[in-house]
Amino acid sequence: ANAKVPSHTISNPF
């Protein structure tokens, strides 16, 4: 969803 974020973030719960 976002650009260059960790595998686990608010945008990506999994």
From Swiss-Prot:
Record keyword Secreted present: yes
Compartmental location: Secreted, Cell wall
Keywords, alphabetical: Cell wall, Secreted
GO CC annotation terms, alphabetical: extracellular region
Major site of localization recorded for this protein: secreted
Source organism, top-level taxon: Eukaryota
Name this polypeptide is given: 64 kDa cell wall protein
